[in-house]
């Protein structure tokens, strides 16, 4: 069943697609951020409920009074399948993928639309992601995102990084009916999509003034558990990417450079050294898991 948006005589420029699974409270702030946009282009929001225990509550559906919001429910099939479903029912020429815990800054959609119009040679766009420095876990996320987006930025403005907390792509560049994302990827689906773009020589262009804050509503222990679980679930996806022969991993020299840059950035009062130690611990855990996985023969 769908909660249909108000009738429109023309397709919106942006179709914002969000997969949700039992996270209605976090989603509220995300949907509110769309209502607070200044001078936005025409847009619609497609919310795919991926088999949540309870249907979307009224306080979610009521955002349909602020902008076109379509809500569809499906049996639990994973985030990739949910995003594919959203893309298939969307109308806009630009597909924008976001997470339920993404918060779009007030001029984000305006900046994204301007960049898309000014750079027709680019087909995909990575929005600039930030963390919430109000908590330690948020400061760790801020440090991680600053480091990745600074060090993986190419001279032409493209980025060797893709994160679907805020990512856009032209509809003409994907097979919407076949699926934008590979549904066999439980985690790491955005990295698999990046590998496909690398194969085509089309890295996403970084839209530096289109800012999305990626919330991390976890305790420190919960974030470490999530990191371990994600690293484990991503391994099969990375095996698929490796089979393609696509070079996407950073080199050991790059890792050392990023480690030094992280230490320098953590000197900012808004981030702090503790964020550096936590982030390094997380990355060491991830590397150990990957080493064990490879040493075991990836069975």
Residue spans for each PLM region:
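A conserved hydrophobic helix/loop-capping motif in glycosyltransferases and polysaccharide synthases
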Residues: 14-26, 30, 37, 48
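Short, flexible, basic/aromatic active-site loop/helix in glycosyltransferases
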Residues: 127, 141-160
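Non-catalytic, C-terminal membrane-associated alpha-helical segments of glycosyltransferases
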Residues: 226-233, 244-299
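Acidic donor-binding loop at a coil-to-helix junction in glycosyltransferase catalytic cores
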Residues: 186-195
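Glycine-rich, basic loop-to-helix element that forms the pyrophosphate-binding segment
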Residues: 74-90
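Conserved donor NDP-sugar-binding/catalytic core segment of glycosyltransferases
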Residues: 107-139
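Short aromatic/hydrophobic "clamp" motif used to bind/position activated sugar donors
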Residues: 95
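Acidic donor-binding segment of Leloir-type glycosyltransferases
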Residues: 31-73
């Amino acid at each position: 069943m769908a909660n249909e948006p108000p009738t429109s005589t023309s397709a919106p420029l942006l179709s914002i697609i969000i997969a949700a699974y039992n996270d209605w409270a976090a989603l509220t702030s995300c949907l509110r951020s769309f209502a607070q946009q200044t001078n936005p282009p025409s847009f619609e929001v497609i919310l795919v409920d991926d088999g949540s225990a309870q249907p979307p509550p009224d306080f979610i559906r009521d955002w349909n009074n602020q902008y076109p919001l379509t809500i569809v429910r499906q049996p639990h099939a994973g985030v990739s399948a949910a995003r594919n479903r959203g893309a298939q029912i969307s109308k806009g020429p630009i597909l924008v993928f976001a997470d339920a815990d993404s918060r779009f800054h007030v001029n984000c959609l305006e900046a994204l639309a301007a960049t898309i119009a000014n750079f027709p040679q680019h087909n995909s766009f990575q929005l600039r992601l930030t963390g919430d420095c109000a908590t330690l876990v948020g400061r760790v996320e801020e440090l991680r995102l600053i480091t990745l987006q600074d060090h993986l930025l190419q001279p032409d403005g493209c980025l060797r990084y893709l994160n679907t907390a805020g990512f856009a792509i032209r509809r003409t560049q994907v097979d919407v009916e076949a699926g934008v994302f590979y549904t066999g990827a439980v985690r790491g689906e955005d990295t698999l999509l990046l590998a496909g773009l690398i194969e085509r020589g089309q890295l996403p262009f970084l839209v530096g003034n289109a800012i999305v804050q990626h919330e991390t509503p976890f305790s420190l222990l919960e974030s470490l558990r999530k990191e371990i679980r994600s690293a484990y679930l991503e391994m099969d996806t990375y095996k698929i990417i490796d089979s393609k022969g696509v070079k996407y991993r950073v080199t050991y020299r790059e890792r050392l450079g990023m480690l030094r840059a992280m230490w320098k950035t953590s000197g900012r009062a808004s981030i702090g050294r503790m964020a550096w130690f936590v982030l390094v611990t997380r990355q060491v855990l991830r590397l150990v898991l990957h080493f064990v996985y490879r040493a075991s023969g990836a069975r």
